């Protein structure tokens, strides 16, 4: 699983423009950043033979003042050694952006708007820095059952069926929202967790190993335990075992 994800991130780094990673300090974005940081010194395009234009990975986070994501992202960035850019925004900025956000994401769905607003504001700042592509942690929750309601799955078969249902709908919800809110400013988001070859590996695992078993005392005591265990040592425990938060909650509203 680890090797497949490392290869997926490596493939997604194929680019001839300045790039970075979205880093909320949660498990998914931190894993993407951790792997990308290992490859950032060299150009993927020529088989890692020459140094990259930006030999240090740049990471980006946004939130209201004092938000959990800003604090957690800084911890992860310090550990990984990225050039980190943590941006704060105000309620007023969020409210002012709503008409543009709704126009770009083309929906009045409240959940989509909540998640898109900080991403839209972050994309504007990223584009102003000349960055044109970012890696994101989207897709992990759908592959590994990261949403808290997966705790209630009665058995492995129904757990897996719900994973498939969530993945089938990604193009209409999370991925569509992320693409529209970022591309509004010409920033391309890429999602290594949804790399086809990685998904072939991840979805081949028996769903029982993805389910939460709080009584086990092992990795499965928390959602996405199989993923956390695979990357043991990549991140500090406070990040590797951080509880899942919605993006809109993590940025502080």
Where is each model-derived feature located?
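ATP-dependent adenylate-handling active sites, centered on carboxylate activation for C-N bond formation
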Residues: 1-235, 249-252
């Amino acid at each position: 699983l680890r090797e497949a994800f490392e290869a997926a991130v490596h493939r997604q780094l194929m680019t001839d423009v300045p790039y970075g990673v979205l880093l909320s300090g949660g498990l998914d974005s931190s894993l993407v950043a951790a792997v990308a940081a290992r490859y950032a010194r060299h150009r993927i395009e020529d088989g890692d033979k020459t140094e990259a234009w930006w030999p240090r990975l740049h990471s980006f986070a946004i939130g209201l003042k004092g938000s959990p994501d800003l604090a957690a992202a800084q911890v992860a960035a310090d550990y990984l050694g990225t050039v980190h850019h943590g941006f704060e925004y105000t309620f007023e900025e969020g409210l002012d952006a709503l008409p543009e956000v709704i126009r770009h994401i083309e929906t009045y769905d409240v959940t989509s708007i909540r998640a898109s607003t900080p991403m839209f504001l972050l994309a504007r700042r990223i584009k102003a820095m000349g960055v044109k592509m970012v890696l994101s942690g989207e897709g992990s929750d759908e592959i590994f059952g990261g949403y808290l309601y997966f705790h209630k799955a009665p058995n492995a078969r129904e757990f897996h069926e719900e994973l498939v249902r969530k993945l089938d709908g990604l193009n209409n919800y999370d991925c569509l929202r992320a693409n529209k809110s970022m591309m509004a400013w010409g920033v391309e988001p890429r999602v290594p967790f949804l790399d086809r070859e990685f998904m072939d590996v991840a979805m081949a695992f028996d769903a029982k190993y993805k389910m939460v078993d709080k009584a086990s005392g092992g990795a499965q005591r928390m959602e996405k335990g199989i993923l956390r265990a695979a990357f043991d040592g990549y991140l500090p425990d406070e990040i590797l075992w951080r509880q899942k938060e919605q993006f809109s909650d993590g940025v502080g509203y």
